[in-house]
Amino acid sequence: MARSSIEQLTSFLKSVNGRAKKALSQNFLVDGNILRKILATADVQPGDWVLEIGPGFGALSEVLVSQGANVIALEKDPMFEESLSQLPIDIEITDACKYPLASLDDKGWKGKGRIVANLPYHITTPLLTKFFLECPNRWKTVTVMIQDEVARRITANPGDKDYSSLTVFLRFFADVQYAFKVSPNCFYPKPSVSSAVVHMRVHEDFPLSGSEIDEFFALTRAAFGQRRKLLANSLKNLYPKDKVFQVLEHLGFSEKTRPETISLEEYLKIFRLLKDF
């Protein structure tokens, strides 16, 4: 019986006198059709190296292995260690937020691989940030199930109410697509919110490199720190206001431009000009 079976899951939990831990965002996927859709979206090929975060009982791990992937899984809850060890995967009982991704090489990881995961919702943003700041060149694709609200935020367009600094951050590194929505009924226990799968195809090259990346994201974080403010006011702690006005005018923007209306490409132009003016 597949690990996506609710009977299999509940039987396991009973056998270890365990339960889903809300503090770890443990809502286990128990729908085989959704697992197959995730696999198709991620485009996992035999021999691919795949990093999985929070495998839990291993429903996703199982289908990744069936596709011929080399899976390294990071799981915080030791309750699942013995069960996961029955699968042909490399399992680490660790906090994914603290795990040094460079150490994947010690496990035989070769070339560019993929991230495929049902991310714990309470650490979605820290993990997405870590994946790209720590080793952006390691990934071909990132396919994750996250809270639907967050999925809509990171796939929003300039001018949308959900458009945010996280949107700009992820688009710097990848093409980001909203793949499909997932009902709470597909989980055990049922979460109180809907979920969604997002697929990111990582760029071969990035617009900036080195310390400029940190400087650029300092600008975008400041811009969105007080999103109802004018851009020039939001950036006043980083750049003189008159300099920001000069750059905006040079690029054809109004002095009343707000941060949530500016695209990644436009932010890059603003950043480069602020460095040069």
From Swiss-Prot:
List the catalysed reactions.
Answer: adenosine(1518)/adenosine(1519) in 16S rRNA + 4 S-adenosyl-L-methionine = N(6)-dimethyladenosine(1518)/N(6)-dimethyladenosine(1519) in 16S rRNA + 4 S-adenosyl-L-homocysteine + 4 H(+)
Q: Does the keyword Hydrolase apply?
A: no
The EC number(s) attached to this protein equal 2.1.1.182
Give all cystine bridges in this chain: none
Q: Which superkingdom, per the lineage? A: Bacteria
Q: Where does S-adenosyl-L-methionine bind?
A: N27, L29, G54, E75, D95, N118
Q: Which residue stretches, if any, does this entry annotate as coiled coil?
A: none
Q: Where in the cell is it found?
A: Cytoplasm
**Alphabetized UniProt keyword annotations:** Cytoplasm, Methyltransferase, RNA-binding, rRNA processing, S-adenosyl-L-methionine, Transferase
Q: A cellular component term (GO) from this record?
A: cytosol
A Pfam family cross-referenced in the UniProt record is RrnaAD
Name the InterPro entries on file: KsgA/Erm (IPR001737), rRNA_Ade_diMease-like_C (IPR023165), rRNA_Ade_Mease_Trfase_CS (IPR020596), rRNA_Ade_methylase_Trfase_N (IPR020598), rRNA_adenine_dimethylase (IPR011530), SAM-dependent_MTases_sf (IPR029063)
Cite the GO molecular-function annotations of the record: 16S rRNA (adenine(1518)-N(6)/adenine(1519)-N(6))-dimethyltransferase activity; RNA binding
EC class of the enzyme, as a word: transferase
Family listed: Belongs to the class I-like SAM-binding methyltransferase superfamily. rRNA adenine N(6)-methyltransferase family. RsmA subfamily.
The UniProt function text for this chain reads: Specifically dimethylates two adjacent adenosines (A1518 and A1519) in the loop of a conserved hairpin near the 3'-end of 16S rRNA in the 30S particle. May play a critical role in biogenesis of 30S subunits.
Q: What is this protein's record name?
A: Ribosomal RNA small subunit methyltransferase A
Q: Which organism is the protein's source? A: Chlamydia muridarum (strain MoPn / Nigg)
Q: What is the name of the gene encoding this protein?
A: rsmA
